[in-house]
């Protein structure tokens, strides 16, 4: 399957769970025929229970619902939580679950990291937000900053077709009428052009990265990238510096208060290379950054699940939406500029690691390890990931007046 640019879409930016969850739950409540939901993490907390209730109500009124969770990201849902959904008819699957070894999860690599919802063939959501309370702004200092989009329009058919082709037990019909054409700058704000792109471990290994590289090559005035886990390869780093050196304002927002300390260490290894190449680097200090968004000039933007690190670019299953629309671009720019002004600290010379022989050695070793990490993982014993469907709980055998006790055989008096 290969998608082309689709015109005439309405796309709404959603910030954090505060905006994302109500929009998703409302769309599920309006579903008439089919719901498909994929996510990396679903916790059995307040947010997870609200999603559970919305899916349960939809299934009880006859809507066909399918849920795909990652076997590493969502390993601890209770049997009762899942069983109530499957009993109502929800098809519930885990992507490549594996038993723990000495209490540790071993299925770390090649994860299903997409976050997608499709409602009938009318509405879709794509982004980086999981289903857990930590995506709500009132969660506290560890609340995550993140983004998703709500989409209506022709591109929803592409997202649905992608899901149908990647779920088992379905036979998608070919859409011979689908148009493929080059995107042009949208002259009608609000009528967005959109392209659905994804990363897999087969024919689309570098599709998302290629669109980032193309964007950096074509940028004329401005690029803003906000990415939670930033440690890309040489090509993307070189493209960022090259754009900055030809006069493009290149701004990078990374985690200043990361949820994993190694993230900060990894990103700071790149500060010398980027800052001295003209890239403006900002550390987001308000709380952990979990977003994966970018914009270019006044019309290009992307929102999705893909980080710019070895796991997302070389191993995980990811999905992004690329958008050509001046109105959406301006909305995202206003949001990111507000973050830069109010919640970020720009990396200056005083924050750069000192260029000692020890720091240089650490940087070189760490950079090359992370750069070659996907190839090293590739040498591990390969297997075909599988989707494990959770069966409905077994129904207890019903006692009836006509049942015969095997120890007291005979006819009913």
Swiss-Prot record:
This is Cardiolipin synthase B. Coiled coil: none annotated. It catalyses: 2 a 1,2-diacyl-sn-glycero-3-phospho-(1'-sn-glycerol) = a cardiolipin + glycerol. NCBIfam families: PRK11263.1. Catalyzes the phosphatidyl group transfer from one phosphatidylglycerol molecule to another to form cardiolipin (CL) (diphosphatidylglycerol) and glycerol. The active site is at 113, 115, 120, 290, 292, 297. Gene3D superfamilies: Endonuclease Chain A. Its EC number is 2.7.8.-. It is a peripheral membrane protein. It comes from Salmonella typhi. Keywords: Cell membrane, Lipid biosynthesis, Lipid metabolism, Membrane, Phospholipid biosynthesis, Phospholipid metabolism, Repeat, Transferase. Residues 108-135, 285-312 form the PLD phosphodiesterase domain. It is an enzyme of class 2 (transferase). Belongs to the phospholipase D family. Cardiolipin synthase subfamily. ClsB sub-subfamily. It is found in: Cell membrane. The keyword Repeat applies. Its main location: membrane. InterPro entries: Cardiolipin_synth_ClsB, PLD-like_dom, PLipase_D/transphosphatidylase. The lineage of its organism: Bacteria, Pseudomonadati, Pseudomonadota, Gammaproteobacteria, Enterobacterales. The keyword Lipid biosynthesis applies. Residues 388-413 are annotated as: Disordered. GO terms for biological process: cardiolipin biosynthetic process. It holds the Pfam family PLDc_2. GO terms for cellular component: plasma membrane. GO terms for molecular function: cardiolipin synthase activity.
């Amino acid at each position: 399957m290969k998608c082309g640019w689709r015109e005439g879409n309405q796309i709404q930016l959603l910030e954090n769970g505060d905006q994302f969850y109500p929009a998703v739950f409302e769309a599920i409540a309006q579903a008439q025929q089919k719901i498909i939901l994929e996510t990396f993490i679903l916790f059995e907390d307040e947010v997870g229970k609200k999603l559970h209730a919305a899916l349960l109500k939809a299934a009880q009124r006859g809507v066909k619902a399918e849920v795909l969770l990652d076997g590493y990201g969502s390993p601890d849902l209770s049997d009762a939580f899942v069983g109530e959904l499957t009993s109502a008819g929800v098809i519930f699957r885990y992507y490549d679950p594996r038993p723990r070894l000495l209490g540790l999860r071993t299925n770390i690599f090649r994860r299903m990291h997409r976050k997608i919802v499709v409602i009938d063939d009318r509405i879709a959501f794509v982004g980086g937000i999981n289903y857990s309370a930590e995506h709500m702004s009132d969660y506290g200092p560890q609340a995550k900053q993140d983004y998703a989009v709500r989409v209506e329009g022709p591109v929803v058919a592409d997202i649905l077709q992608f899901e149908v082709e990647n779920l088992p037990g379905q036979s998608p019909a070919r859409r011979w009428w689908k148009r493929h054409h080059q995107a042009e700058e949208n002259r009608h704000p609000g009528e967005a052009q959109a392209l659905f792109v994804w990363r897999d471990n087969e024919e689309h290994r570098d599709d998302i990265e290629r669109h980032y590289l193309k964007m950096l090559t074509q940028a004329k005035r401005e690029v803003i990238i906000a990415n939670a886990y930033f440690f890309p390869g040489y090509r993307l780093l070189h493209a960022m510096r090259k754009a900055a050196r030809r006069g493009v304002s290149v701004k990078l927002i990374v985690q200043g208060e990361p949820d994993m300390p190694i993230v900060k260490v990894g990103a700071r290894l790149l500060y010398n290379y980027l800052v001295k190449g003209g890239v403006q680097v900002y550390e987001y200090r308000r709380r952990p950054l979990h977003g994966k968004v970018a914009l270019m000039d006044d019309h290009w933007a992307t929102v999705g699940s893909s980080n710019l690190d070895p796991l997302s670019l070389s191993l995980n299953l990811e999905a992004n939406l690329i958008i050509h629309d001046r109105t959406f671009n301006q909305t995202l720019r206003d949001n990111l500029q507000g973050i830069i002004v109010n919640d970020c600290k720009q990396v200056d010379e005083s924050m750069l690691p000192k260029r000692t022989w020890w720091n240089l050695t650490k940087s070189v070793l760490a950079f090359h390890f992370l750069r070659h990490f996907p190839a090293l993982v590739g040498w591990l014993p390969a297997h075909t990931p599988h989707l494990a469907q959770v069966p409905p709980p077994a129904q207890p055998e019903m006692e009836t007046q006509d049942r015969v006790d095997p120890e007291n055989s005979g006819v009913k008096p």
